[in-house]
UniProtKB/Swiss-Prot annotation:
UniProt organism field: Danio rerio (Zebrafish)
Physiological role: Catalyzes the formation of aromatic C18 estrogens from C19 androgens.
The EC number(s) this enzyme carries: 1.14.14.14
Name this protein carries in UniProt: Aromatase
Stored SUPFAM superfamilies: Cytochrome P450 (SSF48264)
Recorded topology in the membrane: Peripheral membrane protein
Binding residues annotated for heme, in chain numbering: 456
Family: Belongs to the cytochrome P450 family.
Cofactor(s) the protein needs: heme
Designated gene of the protein: cyp19a1a
Domain of life assignment: Eukaryota
Lineage, broadest ranks: Eukaryota, Metazoa, Chordata, Craniata, Vertebrata
One annotated GO biological process: female sex differentiation
Gene Ontology molecular function, alphabetical: aromatase activity; heme binding; iron ion binding
Length: 509
């Protein structure tokens, strides 16, 4: 029984059937595929983890790649944004894009990437860095008005700009600054003594042109010192300024069509020729002078030219820019201030009371200027609430990072300072109120003249001029504009600067 149950064990060759062989091969193949699948799955998992890691790093790193702004959309975005700047003006377009996309916006001007900044920290970053001492604008446009690598305002030849800036700094500080108050007071009073040429048959006074006449006379006495026809020169300055803001960002094709820009080229040349004639008068004056106790701005430039330091064209452009700087900025600022005074009679009363208290019946002295604190707050609030120049244009000289955004070398920058001045730092940002300057305002929130290496070189003399002219004017007259003549109601343009549309009936007082 046991033998039947337990047969002897032996190994005998067995021929496997084809079906069995196929089954074994299939199992081996399936094992290989499973191994390959496992390897592929592991690789995919690793790649997925690496991708997540890269995304996490990208999310947490400070540099951002996408700046808010209009879409490129196959090149249509750059065309539309450029057309808006050309059509509505640089200032108006900048306000539009900041309002729509935020305080850091990317647009295009003439195909070039341009950032519009109104965030105070971003604006301050650009102002204080020498990386942004260059400006941008049409090369052919700047050549048309003589500003390409000449003068100081739009000169982007940094080495030459630094050289000529030294002449401006010397003229606008030191002895020149000390003489400013007396010259402003004398000029204002002499013009107020003879208002006949600026008064119409109804007794209405063209106050804006009065202020321009005063300012151009002050500029001549301080920096040029030759006889000139104020009204004739002001007409040429006005046409030059119109040309400046017209050609500044025009495309190159505009200048290849002579019939399009012929008028502007002629208007620019008229002022250049007038300034050349005034410089020649100055040379004759210097040649006949018995002694040279005081060398003004133009005299210093003439001697620099004679020593081979500056070209004749650069001397002409420097004098031209010194002469035009105030009539279309400071004079219009004063005009807006007078309108704001009449819209805020309580402020006018405070200023008049302060003048009576500080001057105490005396004529204005240098020692009085620092004591006119209410007047200074009024000037600052006027420059904040309704600035004439509410933006500045720069170009990046190297790669940089602004508020976490990568900025490439050559990027255009528009600092929308006027919009920045309406920030929540001020207690009443959207109202005209001296309360906004009740306490000290840090420079990063208030930049009427800029700061850093390319700040306005005449910012100190400008404050002296405004105080002196306002004191002289308010001591003798009260300005009463027509009812419709308010800062909010008068027609204005905002291209290169905010300027009233000069309709005589609306600007008379």
């Amino acid at each position: 029984m046991a033998g039947d149950l337990l047969q002897p064990c032996g190994m005998k060759p067995v021929r496997l059937g084809e079906a069995v062989v196929d089954l074994l091969i299939q199992r081996a193949h399936n094992g290989t595929e499973r191994a390959q699948d496992n390897a592929c799955g592991a690789t995919a998992t690793i790649l997925l983890l690496l991708l997540c890691l890269l995304l996490a790093i990208r999310h947490h790193r400070p540099h951002k790649s996408h700046i808010p702004g209009p879409s490129f959309f196959f090149g249509l975005g750059p065309v539309v944004s450029y057309c808006r700047f050309i059509w509505s003006g640089i200032g108006t377009a900048s306000n539009y894009y900041n309002s729509k996309y935020g305080d850091i916006v990317r647009v295009w001007i003439n195909g070039e990437e341009t950032l519009i900044l109104s965030r105070s920290s971003a604006v301050y970053h650009v102002l204080r860095k020498s990386l942004y001492t260059s400006r941008f604008g049409s090369k052919l446009g700047l050549q048309c008005i003589g500003m390409h690598e000449q003068g100081i305002i739009f000169n982007s030849n940094v080495a030459l700009w630094k050289k000529v800036r030294a002449f401006y700094a010397k003229a606008l500080t030191g002895p020149g600054l000390q003489r400013t108050m007396e010259i402003c007071t004398t000029s204002t009073n002499s013009h107020l003594d003879d208002l006949s040429q600026l008064t119409d048959a109804q007794g209405q006074l063209d106050i804006l042109n009065l202020l321009r006449c005063i300012v151009v006379d002050v500029s001549n006495r301080l920096f040029l010192g030759v006889p000139l026809n104020e009204h004739d020169l002001l007409q040429k300055i006005h046409k030059y300024f119109d040309t400046w803001q017209t050609v500044l960002i025009k495309p190159d094709v505009y200048f290849r069509l002579d019939w399009l820009h012929r008028k502007h080229k002629r208007d620019a040349q008229e002022l250049q020729d007038a300034i050349t004639a005034l410089i020649e008068q100055k040379k004759v004056q210097l040649a006949h002078a018995e002694k040279l106790d005081h060398l003004d701005f133009t005299a210093e430039l003439i001697f620099a030219q004679s020593h081979g330091e500056l070209s004749a064209e650069n001397v002409r452009q420097c004098v031209l820019e010194m002469v035009i700087a105030a009539p279309d900025t400071l004079s219009i600022s004063l005009f807006f201030m007078l309108l704001l005074l009449k819209q805020n009679p309580d402020v006018e009363l405070k200023i008049l009371q302060e003048m009576d208290s500080v001057l105490a019946g005396q004529s204005l002295q240098h020692s009085h200027l620092s004591k006119l604190q209410i007047l200074e707050s009024f000037i600052n609030e006027s420059l904040r609430f309704h600035p004439v120049v509410d933006f500045t244009m720069r170009r990046a000289l190297d790669d940089d990072v602004i508020e976490g955004y990568n900025v490439k070398k050559g990027t255009n920058i528009i600092l929308n300072v006027g919009r920045m001045h309406r920030s929540e730092f001020f207690s009443k940002p959207n109202q005209f109120s001296l309360d906004n300057f009740h306490k000290n305002v840090p420079s990063r929130f208030f930049q009427p003249f800029g700061s850093g290496p390319r700040s306005c070189v005449g910012k100190h003399i400008a404050m002296v001029m405004m105080k002196s002219i306002l004191v002289a004017l308010l001591s003798r007259f009260s300005v009463c504009p027509m009812k419709a003549c308010t800062v909010e109601n008068i027609p204005q343009t905002n291209n290169l600067s905010q300027q009233p549309v000069e309709e005589p009936s609306s600007l008379s007082v």
